[in-house]
From Swiss-Prot:
Pathway: Protein modification; protein ubiquitination. PANTHER family: E3 UBIQUITIN-PROTEIN LIGASE MAKORIN-2, MAKORIN-RELATED. Disulfide bonds: none annotated. It is found in: Cytoplasm; Nucleus. It comes from Takifugu rubripes (Japanese pufferfish). This is E3 ubiquitin-protein ligase makorin-2. It comes from the Eukaryota. Keywords: Cytoplasm, Developmental protein, Differentiation, Metal-binding, Neurogenesis, Nucleus, Repeat, Transcription, Transcription regulation, Transferase, Ubl conjugation pathway, Zinc, Zinc-finger.
Length: 402
């Protein structure tokens, strides 16, 4: 088959630049149709009468005969299409809803070839292969059963829509329930109920957090000026309300012992860690669930002190962060060493340094500066009282005597 038997598609649209030197046929009446709109055969051509391809309907008997329709569909009307040199106009997305119901569909128009080589390949392949239309049974299986527009709100075609409009769900209010598929109905209702319960729990948590005041800064947590500060710092062993910034500042201070800073500022109950949360949790079960989520999330982050085995974590096996080696394997928790102090107390330590002993000895041997100053002032007063009155005081007392 030569290229002269294939109609030049660029000539049909009036954009052929080769003119008489074109290798394709510029006579629509003598050439064979080179393009058949496969989307029109499925009933899903979104371009309607503005389609550049031939609209060929399937015969009523389902055989090999064709019924030509649409723009340039008949061979007799091909010359009219070529003489008119109709230009292709792309249909806007919002105008697709105004197309007739028979041309509505979800498939997208196939792009036209950009080069002459693509045109040759497309024309030869479409003319040489057998024009056997696809069976409608296979096409109906590919089409969605439920109308996608009715499922998300409103369908423009309503009763004239070629798709099935499902039953309305009582929870979400959308037409997404298939009347012929009980399994799909039960699955959707189950998912809707789970989503509804999650939304209700979130609404209760928001309402519970509206009037919670931080016990340190005395401000309503959810009404702070900086949006990043509108988070609660929930203590693992306490139910007092603190904002995350205040409780972290309290636990990071170095002016007190570790036992004091880990305790609640109000009830003095020690908590191992602080849980950041957008909502306040008072129920103990919800709090335990929040703690488990916090531990699982933190356990995936690498520990900055361990540093993949290059450093030493002061928390040892109690650390909530991930202790992993460079190859990804988890490291065994370090066994902290025990040290017995001079006062009989036992402390755990991972590393022993000489400076720790020197610093501890100085803290125990040297008295506090304030206490030392108080002792000096008391000794001075005692010495003055024991030494008797001064000469000036004695002279003043003698003058005042009668």
């Amino acid at each position: 088959m030569t290229t002269k038997q294939v109609t030049c598609r660029y000539f049909l649209h009036g954009v052929c630049r080769e003119g008489n030197h074109c290798q394709f046929s510029h006579d629509p009446s003598s050439s064979k149709p080179s393009t058949i709109c496969k989307f029109y055969q499925r009933g899903t051509c979104a371009y309607g009468e503005r389609c550049r391809y031939d609209h060929v309907k399937l015969s009523s008997r389902g055989g090999g005969a064709f019924d030509m329709a649409g723009v340039g569909g008949a061979r007799d009307g091909a010359s009219t299409r070529g003489a008119a040199k109709k230009t292709f106009v792309h249909q806007e997305r919002e105008n697709m809803f105004r197309a007739p119901a028979e041309s509505f569909g979800a498939d997208v128009m196939a792009p036209a070839p950009h080069t002459y080589v693509d045109a040759i390949r497309t024309g030869l392949s479409s003319s040489s292969q057998d024009h056997t239309p696809p069976t409608m049974a296979g096409v109906n299986q590919d089409l969605p059963r439920l109308c996608p527009y009715a499922a998300v709100g409103h369908c423009y075609y309503e009763e004239n829509c070629i798709y099935l409009h499902g039953d309305k769900c009582e929870v979400c209010g959308l037409q997404v329930l298939d009347p012929h598929n009980p399994e799909q109905r039960s699955m959707h209702e189950k998912m809707c109920l789970l989503a509804f319960e999650a939304d209700m729990e979130k609404a209760f948590a928001v309402q519970l957090s509206q009037e919670k005041v931080c016990s340190i800064c005395m401000e309503v947590v959810v009404q702070k000026m900086n949006p990043s500060d509108r988070r609660f710092g929930i203590l693992s062993s306490c139910c007092h309300v603190f904002c995350l910034a205040c409780i972290r500042k309290w636990r990071c201070t170095r002016n007190f012992s570790n036992k004091i800073i880990k305790s609640c500022p109000e009830c003095r109950v020690a908590s191992e860690f602080v849980i950041p949360s957008v909502y306040w949790e008072e129920n103990q079960e919800d709090k335990v669930h929040l703690i488990e989520l916090f531990k699982s999330g933190v356990g995936k982050k690498p520990c900055k002190y361990f540093d993949q085995g290059r450093g030493s974590c002061p928390f040892g096996g109690k650390c909530l962060y991930l202790h992993a080696l460079p190859d990804g394997s988890r490291a065994e928790p370090e066994q902290p060493r025990k040290q017995l102090g001079s006062e009989g107390n036992i402390r755990f330590m991972n590393s022993v340094r000489l400076w720790d002993f020197i610093e501890e000895r100085e803290q125990h041997s040297a008295p506090p500066l304030q206490a030392f100053a108080d002792d000096i002032s008391e000794l001075r007063e005692l010495f003055v009282q024991m030494s008797g009155p001064s000469p000036d005081e004695g002279e003043s007392q003698s003058r005042s005597a009668p």
